[in-house]
C-alpha cells in the first residue's frame, strides 16, 4: 500500500519526470532530512504572523547565501540526496532577516526564533558561504535539474521550485502554533460599487414610506407611474419635492395628512465582512521510513534516519574593572592689596646765641738768645679778623638773620621743618698794637689753652734755634789743641749776625682752625 502511494506521489509531483527526481523531491521537502534538525523537539511558537508568510520566505530564499541555489547534498556514487541542511539554513535566514518584521508582530516570538537559529548553527556548524561550485553534467541532468561539484568532490544539486515551497511550508508548519493561529483570518470591508455617499434628508418616523427619488422626478417630468430600474434594490433616501403634475396631485393630498416633520441624518456607509479560515494539519510519525527507487537497482532499500537535536545553554559571566583617573588643573589668581599709611611730623626749633667777651692779653717775654743775650722781644696776642688784619675800632656786633622754611607733603603725611639759626657776634674794641707777631684765631681759645699754646710754641722755637745754631758753627779755624775750648760758650767769643736768624716754617692758621690741627702744624704731640 505504501509503495503504491509513493508511486502516485512521484507521478503527480514530478509531472512526468524521472522516478529519481520525483522521489528526491519528497525527501528534500522534509526538514527532518537534515541530521541536526528535529521538528518534534521544537515547541511551536509562531502565532502572530500573516498567512502569506511562506510567499515572502520563498521570494527571498535565493538571496541569503551563494549556495542557496544549489543547497541539496548528493551522494557521488548512488546519486541519492544526503541532506538538505543548507536549504534549511537558507529558509531560516530568509524568515529571520527578511520577512519576520514585516509579517509578524510579537517580540517574544522573535526572541524564540533567535534561539532556534542559534541552536541550528551550533548543531550543524557554520555554513561556508564562499565555497565555489563547478557545474557537472551527467545523465540525470535536465533543463530544471543541475549538479555542481564543491570542495572535497562533494556533489550538490539545485532544489526544484515545488521542493523549495514544500520545505518552507513544512518548516513554518513545525514552528506555527495552530491553536492560537489568527493569521489566516482576513477581515475587509466591501464598499458600495459606485463609491457614492448618500444622505438621509427626509423620512417618516415609521420609516416604511419612502419618498420618490429626486433624480427620478427630474428625468420623468413628474410621471409617478414610471420607475427607474437603476434605483431598484438599493436603500436610498432622497429629498422630497412637490410634484406639479396633475396625475400625482391626488396621491400627494392623501399622503399629506399622514406625514410628519422630516429630519436630516448623517451619511451612512454600507459594509460587509467576509471571514476566511484555513486550518493546517500534519502527521508526525516517530520514525520516518523513506523508500528510494533507482533505475540501476531493482531491489528496494529501506533507510532509517535518527534525528538528534541538542539544546545547549551557555551562561557567561564577565567581570569588568573600570579604572579611571581624573586630572584637575587649578588656576590660582593671586590677590595682593597693599595699604600704606605713613604719618611723620617733625618740629625742630633751635636757637643759638654766641657772645664773645673781651679777652685781656698780656705781653709775653721770650728769650731768643740761649747764650745769655739780654735782647728781649715782646709778643702781643689779640683778636684779629679772618684775613690777618686787625679789626677796625668801629666794628661792633653784626647780627645775622636766617629764615626758617617749612616743607609739608599732604600725600605722605610728612612734615619737615628747617631751622636756620640767628647768631649775634660781638667783638670788643681793642687798642692798636705797635709791634709783635700776631696769630689769627686766638679769639676762639680760652685763657688756659692760649697759655699752653704759647708755651709750646716758645719751647719749640728755642729748640729749633738751638739746633740751627749748632749746625751753623764752623770748626775750620780751630785746631785739635783747641778742643778743650769747644765747650766754652761765653758771650765774648760768640757773635750773632742777622744771617743766623731765619724764619721758622710755621704757617699762620686761618680763622676757625681746630686745636688738633694747630698742634699737628706746630709739631706738638
Curated annotation (Swiss-Prot):
Chain coiled-coil ranges: none
Transmembrane segments: 449-469
Chief location bin: membrane
Membrane disposition: Single-pass type I membrane protein
Keywords, alphabetical: Membrane, Signal, Transmembrane, Transmembrane helix
Positions of the UniProt region annotated as Disordered: 242-264
Record bears the keyword ATP-binding: no
GO cellular component, one term: mitochondrion
Signal peptide: 1-21
Topological domains annotated Cytoplasmic: 470-525
Name of the protein in question: Uncharacterized protein YKR005C
Species whose genome carries this gene: Saccharomyces cerevisiae (strain ATCC 204508 / S288c)
Amino acid at each position: 500500500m505504501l509503495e503504491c502511494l509513493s508511486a502516485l506521489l512521484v507521478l503527480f509531483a514530478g509531472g512526468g519526470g524521472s522516478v529519481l527526481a520525483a522521489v528526491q523531491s519528497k525527501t528534500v521537502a522534509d526538514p527532518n532530512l537534515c541530521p541536526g534538525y528535529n521538528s518534534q523537539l521544537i515547541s511551536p511558537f509562531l502565532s502572530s504572523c500573516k498567512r502569506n508568510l511562506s510567499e515572502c520566505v520563498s521570494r527571498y530564499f535565493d538571496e541569503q547565501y551563494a549556495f542557496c541555489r544549489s543547497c541539496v547534498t548528493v551522494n557521488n556514487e548512488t546519486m541519492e540526496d544526503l541532506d538538505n541542511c543548507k536549504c534549511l539554513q537558507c529558509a531560516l535566514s530568509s524568515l529571520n532577516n527578511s520577512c519576520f518584521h514585516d509579517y509578524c508582530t510579537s517580540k517574544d516570538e522573535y526572541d524564540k526564533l533567535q534561539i532556534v537559529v542559534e541552536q541550528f548553527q551550533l548543531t550543524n556548524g557554520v555554513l561556508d558561504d564562499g565555497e565555489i561550485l563547478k557545474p557537472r553534467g551527467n545523465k540525470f541532468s535536465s533543463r530544471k535539474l543541475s549538479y555542481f561539484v564543491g570542495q572535497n568532490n562533494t556533489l550538490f544539486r539545485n532544489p526544484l521550485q515545488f521542493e523549495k515551497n514544500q520545505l518552507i511550508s513544512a518548516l513554518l508548519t513545525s514552528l506555527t502554533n495552530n491553536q492560537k493561529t489568527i493569521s489566516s483570518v482576513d477581515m475587509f470591508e466591501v464598499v458600495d460599487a459606485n463609491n457614492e455617499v448618500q444622505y438621509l434628508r427626509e423620512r417618516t418616523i415609521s420609516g416604511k414610506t419612502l419618498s420618490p427619488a429626486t433624480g427620478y422626478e427630474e428625468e420623468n417630468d413628474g410621471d409617478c407611474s414610471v420607475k427607474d430600474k437603476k434605483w431598484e434594490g438599493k436603500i436610498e433616501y432622497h429629498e422630497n419635492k412637490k410634484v406639479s403634475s396633475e396625475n400625482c396631485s391626488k396621491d400627494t393630498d392623501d399622503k399629506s395628512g399622514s406625514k410628519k416633520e422630516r429630519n436630516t441624518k448623517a451619511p451612512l456607509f454600507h459594509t460587509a465582512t467576509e471571514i476566511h479560515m484555513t486550518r493546517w494539519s500534519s502527521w508526525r510519525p516517530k520514525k520516518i521510513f523513506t523508500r528510494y527507487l533507482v533505475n540501476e537497482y531493482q531491489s528496494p532499500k529501506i533507510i532509517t534516519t535518527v534525528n538528534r537535536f541538542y539544546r545547549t545553554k551557555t551562561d557567561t559571566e564577565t567581570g569588568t574593572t573600570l579604572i579611571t583617573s581624573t586630572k584637575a588643573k587649578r588656576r590660582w589668581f593671586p590677590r595682593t592689596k597693599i595699604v600704606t599709611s605713613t604719618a611723620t611730623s617733625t618740629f625742630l626749633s633751635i636757637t643759638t646765641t654766641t657772645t664773645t667777651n673781651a679777652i685781656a692779653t698780656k705781653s709775653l717775654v721770650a728769650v731768643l738768645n740761649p747764650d745769655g743775650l739780654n735782647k728781649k722781644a715782646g709778643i702781643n696776642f689779640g683778636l684779629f679778623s679772618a684775613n690777618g688784619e686787625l679789626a677796625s675800632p668801629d666794628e661792633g656786633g653784626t647780627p645775622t638773620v636766617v629764615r626758617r622754611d617749612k616743607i609739608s607733603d599732604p600725600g605722605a603725611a610728612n612734615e619737615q621743618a628747617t631751622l636756620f639759626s640767628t647768631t649775634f657776634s660781638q667783638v670788643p674794641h681793642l687798642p692798636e698794637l705797635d709791634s709783635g707777631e700776631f696769630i689769627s684765631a686766638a679769639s676762639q681759645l680760652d685763657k688756659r689753652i692760649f697759655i699752653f699754646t704759647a708755651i709750646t710754641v716758645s719751647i719749640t722755637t728755642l729748640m729749633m734755634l738751638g739746633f740751627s745754631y749748632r749746625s751753623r758753627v764752623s770748626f775750620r779755624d780751630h785746631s785739635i789743641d783747641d778742643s778743650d775750648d769747644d765747650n766754652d760758650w761765653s758771650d765774648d767769643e760768640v757773635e750773632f749776625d742777622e744771617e743766623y736768624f731765619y724764619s721758622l716754617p710755621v704757617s699762620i692758621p686761618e680763622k676757625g682752625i681746630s686745636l688738633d690741627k694747630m698742634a699737628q702744624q706746630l709739631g706738638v704731640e
